[in-house]
Amino acid sequence: NQIQQVLMPYEGHPQQHRVFNSVKQLDKKIKTIGYMHTVLPCLPTDYIRREGFPEKILVNGQNQKKILNSFLGWDNSQVEAITSLRYTEQNKKNFQKQIFFPYYINNEKKIFKYFKNLILNSKPGHLPNLKVRNHPAMKYSKKHLNLKYLVETFLEKNKNRFSNNELNQNISIFIGSTASVIEALERGINAIHICENTIFDLYHTQLWESILVNEVTTNVFSYKLKEFGKCITIGKNNISFDNLTL
């Protein structure tokens, strides 16, 4: 049977462009489709349209489609916003009352300084009792383990500043460059974002028009959504590629 289309995950990586190029060299009639299974990063330069790009990409939110169309060189017809196949009503994480570490940390002492400043400038009882959640791929990283020690030691010494109540059950803290904060917002979490570098880490309103951003302290920001379902359209439990017209 003749191949009509090639569909593969797409994160803007060079090797993915090479695959799409190779497919077109074999047969120009084959349609190439990239599926963005995650969320665009804070600074989405990897997704600038360039040689080897797929003919069409599927994204899981209207806000992401607009970013690609308005800022990254993609034509409107080349980007389709679909209901997420990854972020579903059933497949959801526990985001409540946690401190999420990113994959990459440059300077853990700098991050800890921003974290400590946030806590000391918050009203006692405003934040819930928090637990550290390290990135699963970084459980042996010296920087991550050092930051974990600093944060947990500080939390223990200042435990009287934290209290669980009905108003703060959905508060969590996210550190560095992470897409998890977007999923958390779409699932009703009040997200606080500690940015090691605001250029690379912050979700700017200039790109993410459906997010309200408020600076809390230096390099620390709180997010709220203007409207749910714009950054990510959470999928139903039974959706698959079979439900899509590609």
Regions found by a protein language model. Give the residues of each.
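Short, aromatic/basic amphipathic alpha-helical patches
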Residues: 18-24, 70-72, 117-121, 141-155, ...
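Active-site and donor-binding regions of nucleotide-sugar-utilizing enzymes
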Residues: 1-83, 179-181
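Anion (oxyanion) recognition and catalysis
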Residues: 24-26, 123-124, 185
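Structural motif
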Residues: 8-12, 36-37, 59-62, 101-107, ...
